[in-house]
Amino acid sequence: MEATRLADQAGTLADLLHQDTAYPAGSRVLEAGCGVGAQTRILARRSPTAHFASVDVSAESLALARAAISRAGLTNVEFQQADLFALPFADGSFDHVFVCFVLEHLRQPEAALPALLRVLRPGGSLTVIEGDHGSAFFHPKSARAQRTIECLNQAQAAAGGDALIGRRLYPLLRAAGLADVQVSPRFVYADSSRPRWVDGFTRKTFIAMVEGAATSALRLGLIDQAAWDEGIADLKRSATDDGTFCYTFFKAVAHKT
């Protein structure tokens, strides 16, 4: 289930991505594109005296997010169904805006940034986190495994997204007129000496994500079933005792002038 994969991913990456994310007491934070609340729980726990408004266009995802926050006993989050491009908030309503794994799915991420900046007060911060599937390297090397990742990227592009957007964060935020743009790479490396990362990231995050693209890749004619199965089998070798896997996320923080 995709919600389970997202929760596993968020838990595994919590310290790597959020160790330097904290919002002051009383601040209002917009989480745009909260999905099933996987990142929401981490944000709300790390900044218990900040108030979060978490929005998503999907009612189904919001229902799962509300349930997750309720189970966690967190009370500093309010959820609302909303389109990122038509946010139902007044100009300058928020002190901070947080966006994680959202821009990669948008046909026009450049158009999303002005919509987010409209509701951010002058001097407020925008934090954006994205991956970049072109940064995936693994051993044993396999052209068949690499092809499955390329199929994931192509399927995402066919849906209007960009699986390589991490490398573009700096120019995107600069072009949007943001100041003090700082982008930091967050590296994941997994081998058998780091079993938590092998299981939590290589298996349950990355390989699970690639496997989730099977239906789209086959439907689009990007690959046949036999080649897909062979590629996935080879990719899974990176999670064995002699395998290794590395990947880079990008975290950008900037301010509205």
PLM feature spans:
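C-terminal helical/coil "lid" or tail adjacent to the Rossmann-like core of SAM-dependent
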Residues: Q182-G243
